[in-house]
Amino acid sequence: MDSLQAIIWDFDGTLVNSEPYWHGEEKRLVAEHGGSWTDEDAFRMVGQHVRITAQHLAEAMRRPDDGDAVMTELISRVARRISDRMPYMPGALELAEAAAASDIRQCIVTASNKDILQAAKAQLPPAFEFIITADDVTHPKPNPEAYELALRRLDLPATQCVILEDSISGSAAGLAAGGLVVGVPMHQPLEPHPRMAIFDDGLATTNLDRLVDTWRQLKDAE
């Protein structure tokens, strides 16, 4: 087959502009306990499993043994924000709709947990066949397990799909799964790789033709 069969989307920072929600609630949580959490601290957590983020927050709050409780509270706050309003990244919804109209399959692979995606589900278009969250795997991103699971569910080889990712850990996971990756960096610069193209302008100026052409170039370079 010489046509793109599936798009595998990251969620936070790629499909949905939820990073301001995460960063805002992280800052509020730490401030409520007299600690400090800077933009740089928040950006370092982009793409990490929420458990790792929560442990860093707990330490900033001087509550290093309360990582699980902090994680539960952080997820609850962000889920409420997403449930109230889910802002798509510029160009993302249009790209998803164009892909659906062209019968290109789509799914979501995220480092967020099921509570976040449950809050988002009602606002997602029906184009997405399934969602894989951090709760569905033993080893979250940057481990390739989540992307390997997505490829098995799609029953497609990695070269017939394109992975959209914004973070260092997410793109590393996609590449480790053998995927062809299009990086759309938001807060973290991405390192070049033979199987990754980087759209520094994000998806705002990207249409389906550009994505398919890029996928084909990556595939042909294999």
Give the location of each predicted region.
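Conserved phosphate-coupling serine/threonine residues in phosphotransfer and NTP-handling enzymes
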Residues: T14, T110-S112
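Conserved phosphate-coordination/catalytic loops
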Residues: M86, P90, A111, K141
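Asp-based, Mg2+/Mn2+-dependent phosphohydrolase catalytic module
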Residues: M1-Q5, E97-A100, I104, N113-E222
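Glycine/proline-rich, flexible active-site/cofactor-binding loop segments
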Residues: C107
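N-terminal helical cap/lid subdomain that shapes the substrate entry/recognition surface
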Residues: D2-E94, A101-S102
